[in-house]
Structures are given as C-alpha cells and as structure tokens.
A protein has these predicted regions:
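Glycosyltransferase catalytic domains, chiefly GT-A lineage
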Residues: 1-238
C-alpha cells in the first residue's frame, strides 16, 4: 500500500503547512503533497470563482474535495490517501489508523465531534438540497473534515465525487442565507465539513474517536478505538 498525504495552504499558513508535511514524512508517508492555489486548474477556478474568491476558508474549503479528488486520480486502487489540515501536525505514529482503515469494509475513517450537532452547525438548505433533512441526520453529531482518511476503491472515488459536486453548489457550501428556515438551534454553518459529515451518515460510515488532542476526553464514547493522540491540531498560521 502506497501512502499519500496531502494538505493545502495559502500565504498565511505556508509555514504551518511545511511543518505538517515534514511531520508526515517523518512518520512514513511515501508521497507528501503540499498543495497551493496555483495547483488549482484555471478552468475549475473560473467555473467556481464565486466560491473560491471568498476569504473564509480560502474559498469555503472547496479546494479540499477538489485536491482529494485530484490526488485519487493519480493513485492505484488499494493505496491510502490522508488529507490533513495544515494547522496540525503528527506527534505520534499514525500506524494504528493505518491498521484500522485496512480492516475497514468501505475504506474510510471518519472522526466524530461528539455532541456538536448537525442542526446547530449546518444550515437548512444543505440538508434539503442533499435530500437528508430528517432527524436521523439533523439530530446527530457532526463528523470533522480536519482529517479525511481513504483507501482508493470504487466506493471512495464515488464518495469524493459526490462531495466535490455538492461543494460546488453555493447554496450548500457558502454562507448564503438559507432559503429554508434554519433550525432554531442553528449557530453557524460548517461548509465542506457539513457536506462531508452528512455523506458519511448517508453511507453509514462508522464514526471514530478524534485523533488530535480533542479526542482525549472521548475514550468512553469509543471503547473500540484504543489509539492515543496522534496529531496536534493547533489551527495557527505558524
């Protein structure tokens, strides 16, 4: 299994990105790719300029499913792809997660933000336009898109294709005011994370304990996830 690791940064986060990438190399990833704005195909950029030109998330994080999809295209079936936010780095070996994903039937690891509910952090239009506006989705804990782990196979290629398609819809990914009334508990939209999270539930992808320091207090909720902290998620430019 060839292990790919990717991240993305604009000017502010380039130093943090380098630290993240260096830590991935240190812990044994075979190919470490540090993407930047210049790696986005001009045709894709201009097609989605209304989204990608926005400052929040350097384009509401649309680049994330784009680069995951782009990387999958160059990989062989059975290879591992890990996306990591540049505002984090590896402190310990990710081998426990590699062992876990190689046993996973779907080839996906998804990490749960226990207690952070979808209807609080996802605007109503996203539920409606993804045809997932029902309690089993709206009243569940969100999955994070800080780290996305995939084994390339037919299922994950199609999953990422769907992720990317929804992310190109301004009504779903951006902060445009929802035409459908938000749930009363709604606080703030989580953009590509809301999309990724809902797709994980749509396809019954198993939730796992967070791999950063934020997972330390969640061990009781995930007794089968015996791994300790693997990353430090700091969210800082340096």
């Amino acid at each position: 299994v060839k292990k790919y690791h990717i991240n993305y940064a604009n000017g502010r986060y380039l130093q943090a990105q380098k630290y993240c990438s260096d830590s991935a190399k240190q812990f044994g990833f075979d190919e470490v790719i540090s993407y930047s704005l210049s790696d986005i195909d001009p045709e894709f950029y201009f097609k989605n300029k209304n989204i990608l030109a926005q400052s929040r998330g350097a384009g509401f994080w649309l680049w994330k499913p784009y680069f995951i999809s782009k990387t999958l295209e160059r990989m062989e079936n059975g290879d591992l792809l890990v996306y990591s936010d540049s505002g984090s780095f590896y402190q310990n070996s990710p081998q426990p997660l590699i062992d876990l994903i190689l046993k996973d039937e779907k080839g996906v690891l998804s990490f749960e933000l226990k207690g952070l509910m979808e209807n609080v952090y996802t605007k109503r239009d996203t539920f409606v336009l993804m045809d997932l506006d029902e309690p089993k989705y709206t009243e569940s804990s969100q999955r994070e898109a800080t780290y996305i782990w995939l084994i390339k196979n037919d299922f994950t290629v199609n999953l990422v294709k769907e992720y990317l398609e929804y992310a190109q819809d301004e009504r779903i990914i951006t902060d445009l005011i929802s035409e459908n009334k938000n749930y009363d508990v709604f606080k703030d939209h989580r953009h590509d994370q809301s999309i990724w999270s809902l797709l994980c539930k749509k396809y019954n992808i198993e939730p796992h304990k967070l791999i950063s320091q934020w997972g330390d207090g969640m061990k009781n909720h995930f007794p089968n996830d015996t791994y300790n902290q693997i990353t430090l998620h700091h969210r800082n430019p340096i």
